[in-house]
Structure formats: C-alpha cells, structure tokens
C-alpha cells in the first residue's frame, strides 16, 4: 500500500493520507473547498465546489489518474438548496 500526497491539495488534518494506492485501486480522502496555499475556505458554494474538484484532481494527478478514472464519489452538501448549483458544477 502506498500513500499519495501532494502540496497542490490541502494536507490531511489527521493521521490519514490524501489518497492510498492499494495496487489495483486508489482511495481518495474527502476534499473541501480549501485553498492549499492559504488554507482559506473559498467564498460561496460555487467557489467551494470548484476548489474541492480542483483539489481532487490534484490528488488524482499525483497518483497518475484523472477524473475519468473515478467510479464512485460521495458528495456532502450542507444546504440542500445548494444541490442544484453543486450538481451543475460537478456534472
């Protein structure tokens, strides 16, 4: 098992990796809309969604993968009223 880490996404806050490569599968930890350079949360749901996806892409890139390789995700939305906005960006 290999731990995946990149400075192009926020560092893990606990004793876990940004991603783990098990040989056949890469498991990514959750990503927030945090700027990896400053640690600041992006302003608003649109900017947070874009930043979270940018962070995920950076972790995947470090593992030699892209979003095309992703087969499952779980998305948490604090306000269900933002679901349409998140889904539009995410889709």
Task: Show which residues each predicted segment covers.
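Short, polar/acidic, helix-capping and beta-turn segments at strand->helix junctions
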Residues: 1-91
């Amino acid at each position: 098992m290999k731990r995946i880490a990149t400075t192009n996404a926020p560092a893990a806050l606990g004793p876990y990796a940004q991603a783990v490569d098990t040989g056949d599968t890469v498991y990514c930890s959750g990503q927030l809309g945090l700027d990896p350079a400053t640690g600041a949360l992006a302003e608003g749901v649109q900017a947070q969604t874009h930043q979270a996806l940018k962070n995920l892409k950076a972790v995947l890139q470090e593992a030699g993968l892209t979003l095309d390789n992703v087969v499952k995700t779980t998305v948490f939305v604090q306000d269900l009223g933002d679901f349409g906005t998140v889904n539009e960006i995410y889709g």
